[in-house]
Each structure stands twice: as structure tokens, then as C-alpha cells.
């Protein structure tokens, strides 16, 4: 029975020489050596042909897929499992690993087409073209817009379709993306789901994943509304139904847990304490005294003290980082970050104090950051890379200017840098492009000053 054998493979219980033969094929096809659980996951996927991988980030899901693809591609062309094309659907930010890891896995390049900045007509021409492109990378949005062309492509070619970050199709309410991918599924030779978070909202999230992987089978026997209720039901009977659900889906997925990765213990670097410069300390002390006076005067007004505490904290953080941030009135700053600016604080006196700050000194943190960067790059060599996290936009620009003055060029990554979209011109600098070039040593600079909210 197929399900039993798939489950046995999942549990590392394989019979005969099939697994050994699989390993031999991969050793001949791949230059990257898969570790034990990756090899088992690739074998499970190759056997099942249609399966999910719910492994955690960093477990090598891309390599696992390439391993399964390599084996299926090694079969005779007339074999019903043979594939020779990959259609990877995912967010644009997920494309780079597929491009880079192909060469790392196989030891050579191949024909890859990135469907970014490609209009509908050229997408159609690609899917109807007789020219062979081994790997096509396309976003969920573009695939939904080209559904008919994709179906024709899948009918004509022997394609493994991979949905990367497949939570995009979890919508069980008939969303356009979900329906487009589900209606294309029956025409793929092989179907793969990749996501590290298969059911964040409840068991109903699994429904479309398994409809895609096995469109002709009813892997999940429960209707969506039942799965929704099952997610919150804590009764004994519900627990039995959950066990049935897990038993039904378990032959068709693999999951490598974080504990399986044998990762080394993280290296903890204690924070560096940097003393403020003389002028910076004077401004800091002034702000602290100023707001203590406000607390005493306005303590009787309900809620006002808490607002003032927040305002004081913001100002002290700004000052401790870079007094130049104080050039912007507090009301403007609060409004910019979405906090009510009706605090009635008069900033005029402090504004006069800080206007000439840069004539007096450089923020002590900047000096320390520059030295840390120089130390890291000197240790790591030309491939050394440094990310400096920063919140305030003004601070990012000021730090970049200071680093430049110290011979350290850098790139900014924050909200003003556009995201990459399907119709983005190749000449436009985007967040994804900066990250790709930085990761793979194609960026002119090896320092990025980044706002975490822009890259998360």
C-alpha cells in the first residue's frame, strides 16, 4: 500500500535496495552532500512524487527538493515519474536561493528564467516557447494571472511544481491565488509544498495544502468548518479526531525540527557600553531634568504622566544615540511613528541647545561602530560583511555619512527603498536586490545599515 510505504520511509523504515539505489544516484548527480535527514526527506519526496515538507528554516528544503528532482530526472523519459522541468512559485525574495543553490548542488549552471518585470504577453510566450528553460521562478500573483498558460505548459511538459512559502494558498475562502494554484495542480507531474508554518491559524490551514499535493485523493477527510472547530476543541473526542487527522496526513509530509539540526550554541556577544561625549551628556542630563519637572507639575492629570514618560523615554533614546535626532520637534517625531502628538511639550529651549551639536563632537556610538566594523572586516577579509541595525531614519543617514568619512562605504535599507514587484524595472534598486547582492558578495559595499522593519 502506497500510504504505508510512504509512512515507513518517513519513519526511516525502508525495505530492499531502493534507498541505497537512491543514494547512489544522488552521489553521482549532486556535488553537495546531503546529511542523513535531508537524504531521507529527498527519498520520501521522490518516492511519494507529491508531498509536503514542513521543516524549519535553515534545514535545507531547497537542497531536499533538488535531491528529489535529480533522482526523478534520472529516470527514463518514458517513466511516469520522470520530470525535466521545475516551476517554483513563491515570493520574489525566495528566488535567489533556488538560483544560487542549483549550482551549489549540481556543480554547474542551468537555464533559469525569473518572471519578474515580465508583462502578460511575454509570460505567455515563455510558457508556450519551444526553447528549454529548466527552472522557471514565478510569484503567486503572476501565476494566478497566467493560469491558462501555465496549465498548457504543465500539460505539455513533465514539470515538478514547487510552492515555496506555501502559506500563500492556505486561504479556504476561495481566494484568487488559492483557486488558481489548486486548479493547476492536476496537470503537474510532481507537486511539492514547502512551508515551515503549515498550520499557524488552525488545522483548516492544512486543507488547501493537501488539496494541491493530491488533488485526486481526499487526504483530509474532514470538511473545513470541522477543522476550524477542531482547532479550539479540547475535549477527549476532539483529541481522537486530531489523532485521525495526523495519521491521515503523516505519510505525505516530512519535517526536520530545529533540534534535529545539531546547531552549535549561539555565540552571545555582551553589549558594549559606550560613554557619551561631554556635550551629549550635558544635553541628556538637561532633558532628564526637564521632564522630571513636568512629571511633578502634571501628576494630577490622569493619563498625562504616562504620556510624558513615553515622550521622555523617546527623547532620551534619541539623545543617547545621536543628539542630531533632537533637531526634529517631538510632536513631529511622535506623529511620524504613529503616536498622538498632543502632549503640549515646549521643545524650543532644547532645540536651541542641540542645533550646534555636530560642531562640538561626533556621537560616541558612531566612533565605536566604525571601529567595530573595521575590526570585523579586517578579520574576515574582503568577504567580511556587517549589518548595522538602526531605527531612526535620520540616524541611518547620519551614520552612513560618518562611516563614509572614515573610508567605510555602506548601503541603506529602509522603508524608502522599494520592494521588488512583478513589474519592477531591472534598473531599479529594491530591498530584495540589495539583500541578494549583499548575501552573495555582489554588492559594491560590505556594510548595510538596515531598519529591521524593512527587512522582516
Predicted feature residues:
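Walker B catalytic acidic pair
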Residues: 164-165
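Conserved P-loop NTPase motor "coupling/switch" region that bridges the ATPase
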Residues: 82-86, 104, 112, 131-134, ...
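Conserved Walker A/P-loop ATP-binding site and its immediately adjacent core
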Residues: 64, 82-104, 205, 391-394
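Walker A/P-loop
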Residues: 49-68
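Conserved Helicase C-terminal RecA-like lobe
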Residues: 64, 69, 263-280, 303-448, ...
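Conserved helix/coil segment N-terminal to the catalytic DExD/H
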Residues: 121-132, 140-157
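Charged, low-complexity
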Residues: 1-51, 110, 133-135, 139-142, ...
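Conserved helix-turn-beta segment of the N-terminal RecA-like "Helicase ATP-binding" lobe
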Residues: 94-118, 216
Amino acid at each position: 500500500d502506497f500510504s504505508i510505504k510512504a509512512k515507513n520511509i518517513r519513519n526511516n523504515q525502508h525495505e530492499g535496495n531502493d534507498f541505497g539505489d537512491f543514494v547512489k544516484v544522488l552521489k553521482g548527480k549532486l556535488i553537495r552532500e546531503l546529511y542523513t535527514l535531508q537524504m531521507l526527506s529527498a527519498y520520501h519526496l521522490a518516492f511519494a512524487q507529491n508531498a509536503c515538507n514542513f521543516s524549519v528554516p535553515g534545514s535545507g528544503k531547497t537542497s531536499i527538493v533538488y535531491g528529489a528532482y535529480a533522482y526523478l530526472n534520472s529516470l527514463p523519459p518514458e517513466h511516469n515519474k520522470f520530470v525535466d522541468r521545475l516551476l517554483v512559485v513563491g515570493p520574489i525574495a525566495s528566488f535567489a536561493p533556488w538560483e544560487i543553490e542549483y549550482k551549489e548542488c549540481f556543480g554547474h549552471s542551468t537555464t533559469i528564467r525569473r518572471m519578474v518585470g515580465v508583462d502578460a504577453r511575454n509570460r505567455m510566450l515563455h510558457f508556450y516557447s519551444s526553447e528549454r528553460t529548466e527552472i522557471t521562478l514565478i510569484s503567486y500573483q503572476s501565476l494566478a494571472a497566467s493560469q491558462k498558460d501555465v496549465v498548457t505548459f504543465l500539460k505539455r511538459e513533465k514539470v515538478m511544481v514547487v510552492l515555496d512559502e506555501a502559506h500563500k494558498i492556505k486561504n479556504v475562502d476561495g481566494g484568487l491565488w488559492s483557486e488558481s494554484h489548486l486548479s493547476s495542480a492536476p496537470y503537474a507531474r510532481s507537486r511539492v509544498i514547502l512551508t515551515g508554518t503549515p498550520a499557524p491559524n488552525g488545522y483548516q490551514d492544512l486543507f488547501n495544502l493537501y488539496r494541491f499535493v493530491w488533488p485526486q485523493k481526499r487526504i483530509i477527510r474532514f470538511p473545513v468548518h470541522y477543522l476550524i472547530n477542531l482547532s479550539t476543541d479540547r475535549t477527549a473526542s476532539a483529541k481522537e479526531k486530531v489523532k485521525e487527522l495526523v495519521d491521515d496526513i503523516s505519510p505525505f509530509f516530512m519535517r526536520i525540527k530545529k533540534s534535529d539540526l545539531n546547531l552549535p550554541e549561539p555565540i552571545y556577544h555582551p553589549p558594549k557600553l559606550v560613554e557619551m561625549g561631554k556635550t551629549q551628556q550635558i544635553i541628556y542630563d538637561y532633558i532628564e531634568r526637564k521632564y522630571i519637572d513636568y512629571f511633578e507639575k502634571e501628576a494630577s492629570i490622569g493619563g498625562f504622566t504616562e504620556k510624558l514618560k513615553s515622550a521622555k523615554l523617546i527623547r532620551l533614546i534619541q539623545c543617547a544615540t545621536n543628539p542630531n535626532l533632537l533637531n526634529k520637534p517631538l510632536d513631529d517625531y511622535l506623529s511620524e511613528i504613529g503616536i498622538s502628538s498632543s502632549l503640549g511639550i515646549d521643545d524650543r529651549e532644547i532645540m536651541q541647545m542641540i542645533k550646534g551639536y555636530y560642531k562640538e563632537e561626533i556621537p560616541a556610538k558612531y566612533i565605536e561602530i566604525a571601529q567595530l566594523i573595521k575590526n570585523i572586516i579586517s578579520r574576515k577579509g574582503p568577504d567580511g560583511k556587517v549589518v548595522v541595525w538602526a531605527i531612526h531614519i535620520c540616524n541611518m543617514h547620519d551614520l552612513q555619512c560618518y562611516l563614509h568619512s572614515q573610508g567605510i562605504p555602506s548601503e541603506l535599507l529602509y522603508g524608502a527603498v522599494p520592494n521588488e514587484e512583478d513589474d519592477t524595472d531591472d534598473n531599479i534598486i529594491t530591498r530584495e536586490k540589495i539583500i541578494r547582492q549583499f548575501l552573495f558578495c555582489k554588492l559594491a559595499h560590505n556594510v548595510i545599515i538596515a531598519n529591521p522593519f524593512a527587512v522582516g
